[in-house]
């Protein structure tokens, strides 16, 4: 990462942050005016900040350099040729019809064809990062800019594009 910074690129992409050295180099590069994009294995935005802290990233560096954390997941898309209403959802309630996978020739018997992405964005403002870096027990969904992963997944289930099991 340090050798890349010397070439003065506008954007630096770090494939994956796995160790303290890579985390520190990426954070330092962001302080020199470079846009740094990186991947990190974490369950959500809050745990991504905690993971960086666990890797030894200095709190002050995190406060200054994180612009946003985007968390993404892929859900399997229900096959429209064979999806079927979820059994037990025949109640006369004001809830949308939910569907489950069935399986047909179009989807090779899996009940799913393709994938769809769900996302959540955690703004990297200093107050948010400080709360998470200090490991305070703050519900991440209160800090989000938009919907949580769960809300996005439930929305797709309600629209019939994926199953509740996804």
Model-flagged regions — what are they?
Residues 1-166:
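Short, flexible helix-loop junctions that flank or precede catalytic/ligand sites
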């Amino acid at each position: 990462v340090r050798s890349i910074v010397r070439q003065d690129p506008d954007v630096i992409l770090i494939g994956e942050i796995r160790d303290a050295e890579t985390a520190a180099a990426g954070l330092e590069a962001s302080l020199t005016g470079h846009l740094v994009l990186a991947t990190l294995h974490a369950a959500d935005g809050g745990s991504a900040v905690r993971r960086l802290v666990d890797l030894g990233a200095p709190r002050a560096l995190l406060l200054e350099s994180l612009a946003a954390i985007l968390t993404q997941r892929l859900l399997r898309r229900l096959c429209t040729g064979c999806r079927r209403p979820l059994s037990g959802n025949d109640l006369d309630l004001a809830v949308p019809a939910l569907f489950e996978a069935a399986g047909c020739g179009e989807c090779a018997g899996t009940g799913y064809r393709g994938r769809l992405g769900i996302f959540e964005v955690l703004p990297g403002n200093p107050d948010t990062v400080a709360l998470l870096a200090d490991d305070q027990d703050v519900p991440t969904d209160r800090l989000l800019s938009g919907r949580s992963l769960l809300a996005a997944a439930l929305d797709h289930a309600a629209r019939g594009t994926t199953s509740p099991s996804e």
